[in-house]
Amino acid sequence: MSDAIRAFDLVAGTYDDWYNHPQGRQVFDAELNALDLHIPKEGIGLELGAGTGIFAEHLTGAGRTIVCLDPSREMLKKAVERGMASVLGVGDALPLRVGVLDFIYMVTVLEFLDEPVAVLEELRETAKGDAGLTVLFINSESSWGDLYRDIGSKGDPVFKHARLYTMAEVEALITVSGYSVTERVGTLTTKPMETEVGGAITELSSENGVIVLRVHAS
């Protein structure tokens, strides 16, 4: 078990507390809205690194089924408690049948992957040929990136294991993994110290705290 997986196991019981904080709830709503607009309304999807299943639960709807996959047993127990279909596993060796998934998405997962290219290639090879992948990640160049980098350097049990990326770095990973970017948007347009979170979906700028990419196999 990697140190990062062990860290998520240890914080599973309190991981969602941030979303009950007024600012945390606004961040959640902004990210949820961005995801909802950039994954199909129908089909079978996979949330890679689904953790407690909080996003999958809110994104599941009529015609849209989501399977949660995570390597942390303790985090995944929370997803099961939410009633989500859940699979214990890792992204570079998916325990799923090839050609079933209509879409895949990940939320702040790229930052914790030891071998991101291997994972992205596995996703491409496992999903349907026309399936899209949606990647939400922290913008390393933003003030939110500065915040998470700072708390990681100060020993936060989770973010000390994170590797933040710039937009250019993520696009390079996407390209070498056999994908092409078809859409780029951002959200979190305000700084972390502001109580009101800018949750609008915008064209990309250095101020966007998170970036959402929609990509397809080349």
In which residue ranges do the predicted regions lie?
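Class I SAM-dependent methyltransferase SAM/SAH-binding core
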Residues: 46, 51-93
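Short catalytic micro-motifs in class I SAM-dependent methyltransferases
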Residues: 108-111
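A C-terminal cap/extension of S-adenosyl-L-methionine-dependent methyltransferases
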Residues: 181-218
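A short glycine-rich, Lys/Arg-flanked "PGG" loop and its adjoining helix->strand segment in the class I
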Residues: 117-129
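A conserved beta-strand element that flanks and buttresses the S-adenosyl-L-methionine
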Residues: 105
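Conserved class I S-adenosyl-L-methionine
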Residues: 1-41, 54-58, 78, 132-161, 194-195, ...
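Short alpha-helix
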Residues: 161-178, 182-184
